[in-house]
Design a protein with these regions (language model features):
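Small/polar/charged residue-enriched interaction surfaces, especially the RNA/DNA-contacting tracks
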Residues: 1-157
Length: 157
């Protein structure tokens, strides 16, 4: 068995930059994606279906993460068949079920290998999120802001 560079860090970096451009608040999903790895591949894959209706930018972040994961796995294990289709929750149940059943065909060893790579990808996404996330507001009030607020509200002093 030869060593294969998965390029997980590079993929994670690109995913975070794209998500930040799309909607910087969607980066909060990085932590939830990492936590959802504990529930397995199938549930991680299905997370974009759950988010699609109410939080589409977060769903896109999960979807793009899954696509990057599939790309990584295809380059390292072309023989491995994992669901690569990213469906919408409006798809026919037959189509969703057919795609989800691909998980059942994976051996335990293949599932473990895939999950290890997915966890590494999500860990890298969290790492890059912590470094690249844009702040929506400054963490501390400026001294001038505090002085102005106390001038406008004499009861606060």
């Amino acid at each position: 068995m030869a060593w294969h560079p998965f390029n997980v860090d590079h993929e994670a970096h690109m995913l975070v930059l794209e998500a930040r451009e799309r909607d910087r608040d969607s980066l909060n999903q990085a932590y939830k994606m990492r936590a959802s790895c504990a529930y397995g591949l199938e549930r991680f894959w299905g997370e974009h279906l759950r988010l699609r209706g109410k939080e589409p930018t977060k769903a896109d972040f999960v979807k793009e993460t899954w696509k990057a994961f599939c790309k990584i796995m295809k380059e390292s294990r072309p023989d491995l068949i994992i669901p690569q289709e990213v469906l919408s929750n409006r798809e026919k149940e037959v189509d969703i079920r057919a795609e989800a059943e691909k998980f059942l065909r994976l051996s335990t060893a293949d599932q473990q290998e895939c999950l290890t790579v997915l966890v590494a990808l999500c860990d890298a996404i969290v790492w890059w999120t912590q470094r690249l996330k844009l702040k929506s507001k400054p963490p501390h009030a400026d001294a001038n802001d505090i002085a102005a607020a106390s001038e406008n509200n004499p009861e606060s002093t």
